[in-house]
Curated annotation (Swiss-Prot):
This is Ribosomal RNA small subunit methyltransferase G. It catalyses: guanosine(527) in 16S rRNA + S-adenosyl-L-methionine = N(7)-methylguanosine(527) in 16S rRNA + S-adenosyl-L-homocysteine. Belongs to the methyltransferase superfamily. RNA methyltransferase RsmG family. Its EC number is 2.1.1.170. The gene is rsmG. CDD domains: AdoMet_MTases. The lineage of its organism: Bacteria, Pseudomonadati, Pseudomonadota, Gammaproteobacteria, Enterobacterales. Gene3D superfamilies: Vaccinia Virus protein VP39 (3.40.50.150).
Amino acid sequence: MLNKLSRLLDEAGISLTDHQKNQLIAYVDMLHKWNKAYNLTSVRDPNEMLVRHILDSIVMAPHLQGERFIDVGTGPGLPGIPLSIVRPESHFTLLDSLGKRVRFLRQVQHELKLENITPVQSRVEEFPSEPPFDGVISRAFASLDDMLSWCRHLPGENGRFYALKGQLPEEEIASLPAAFSVESVVKLRVPQLEGERHLVVIKPNKI
């Protein structure tokens, strides 16, 4: 599996240390093992997880600005755990409302010795925003409108929302609330992944 990960990283133009690669592999191993009992993801094949979960998460890393991030609706830690491995200088709060997912995240934190994540069980609209975050990240979480409605209290003054999407959600972008605007749309390339991937970066409008 390490050889496959190395090939995928080369194709994506991403350079990681051997330690980071081993951490990503260990995370996939844990996800595969726990998935049998906890049903954390519909992806069953570890090699497929490398593409659809690991690479699909870390290709957004170069586009994140800041040091403090919150991954809302993180599920089994996607994209937060892969991002925390490739960006050890940043801190990621991993938020999910389901206890079984948060238990898995805490076990990953323990076994991989990840000191830059904080797993939290909470509904996003009930989670306090102090201190505010530099970035709010979502992957397969909700529509842009719902994401902004539920998470608008989380970013700081210069914070951003980062929504990982498949096809470009043109209708969702067109119907953004007036208090927000799209800063950029990045077309992401994920090796061996079928279909399009886009990162929509949204900023609150200054009043």
